[in-house]
């Protein structure tokens, strides 16, 4: 960006930096052959970044010029941070520009603004159920990989963030169990819902979150009776939502592997959200997917579903998992021992989530949307199983309705629409021709109405529906 900015100062307003990739690959290609293999993609990404930064550079320079024009000796940290946060100006770039004008940067103020934003981001990312909850007891043992029902004891109950000894019907609370089959939200997979059945009460679990590492909080409402500390409960996960969520989670693993085959090995997962309704998958790629790429991705995923691979899970040391080719998510923190999920030879990933026993259970995979969420990050939303069938049937119903409106068959809708568009264009051309003809005939009559004003013929008249041309 500093190089681009210097080029900008020299009058180079078009992207230029990406052109160096060709020369770099010639000089360094023998030592780094992967650079030659990837040079087209590297150049494309660099060009895209240059084009984006050129836009922000122009707007950012206006802000910076406005601040520097105030005859100051020190640029305040808030302005420097705004340039960094909003326009992508690294602090050293702002410092370079200031140095040229004899102006220094308030580094301390910049760091304060940066620290404030980090704190706000941390606060926004905390689960709401964590607020005010202080727990110092034993951790929760998770049995949800093996079963959807398990007996446990409530170690703590929190009402409105405060620890209590019991709750009664109608109370909302967070219950901590020593053992549970409920999956707590993590890794992009939402927490389980279900119920806790005690001898004297029924607690409806709406969500499950980690209130600490290894401590599961079951958030919900006591529907009836009374729940007391140390009560033994039968924890029952809602099987329908768990199954649908597992379908979608396993589908994201297949999707990840398929995208790497279709688009290239540069594709890596950048985020996900998996619930009972759909799967959302963010990944690294610098361009929208074409219709053919989407179709090929869907074909590959559904082909694996038909293979009905057994989903295998194993725990092993992190280094061993990576040696076996397991995909690890960039930026994710892993322990020394990790859980590996394999789906035939098609997909192997590190994952702590819940999955189907065999991929055939997914049934059907259908991409609903593909969009961009940030520079170099694309997002796919997809549905599986019954939801995918419902989606296809809804689209089929829409097509039938359109065909009925156009008085044609579904197979000929595209041809019919093209015909209508062509007819409209022809009608517009004919209308223009008739207007021109009418104006010409009117013009001949109007010419006779011109008045002589001091030797100049003048005609003033109001024409309805006349083309200004």
What are these regions (language model features)?
Residues 1-469:
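A glycine- and charged-residue-rich anion-binding loop/surface
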